[in-house]
Amino acid sequence: IAFMANAQHLTYRSDILDQLGIAAPTTYEEMLEAAGRIRSSGLMQNPVGGAYAAGWNLAEEFVNMYIGHGGEFFKPGTAEIAVNNQHGYDTLNMMKQLSHFMNPDYLTHDSNATSAEWKAGNVALMNMWGSRIGALKGDEVDAAVVKTKSSWFISSRFCLYSL
């Protein structure tokens, strides 16, 4: 029984982007460019967060991005798996590129650890579940992030539903 519809949203620190004159990303390529500029500026070493923990977290990230790349899981009209294709390759490549801007322990980071990185002020860009956004603005958020409560923004440009 479905109990919740959820969506991933691009979440970003507008204070960091504004400080560097970076427009809010609208594509993963722009997200990579923004991450590179943030790292080069010295503001953050690992500006991208992601729930890439080995297991279902990593699989869910692949599934959502694969669908976003236009991938189909099965050959039309069959039960034959069809992820070994250009869409699958593009998805894995983009995930790899994003991981270069993540905490070196990214394969241990689930949604909880990724949220903790955000709350500590260590991350400026990440996809996060809509159901977790409220907690990112909660009372236990680092003072550097709290001061941006009114200026940070959640974009649904990368939004994909998962039931």
Where do the protein language model's features map onto the residues?
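Short helices/loops that flank or line small-molecule/ion binding pockets
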Residues: 16-17, 36-41, 112-126
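A structural signal for short loop-to-beta-strand junctions that line the ligand-binding cleft
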Residues: 1-17, 46, 151-152, 157-162
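Aromatic-glycine-rich donor-binding/catalytic loop that engages nucleotide-sugar donors
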Residues: 14-26, 100-103
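Beta->alpha turn/N-cap motifs
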Residues: 111, 128-133, 154
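Extracytoplasmic/periplasmic solute-binding protein
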Residues: 1-3, 8, 32-80, 87, ...
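Short, solvent-exposed loop/beta-turn-alpha elements that line the ligand-binding surface or hinge
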Residues: 52, 69-90, 138-147, 152, ...
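Glycine-centered hinge/linker elements that transmit conformational signals in sensory
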Residues: 34-37, 77-108, 149
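Short helix-initiation/N-cap motifs at beta->coil->alpha
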Residues: 26-33, 105-120
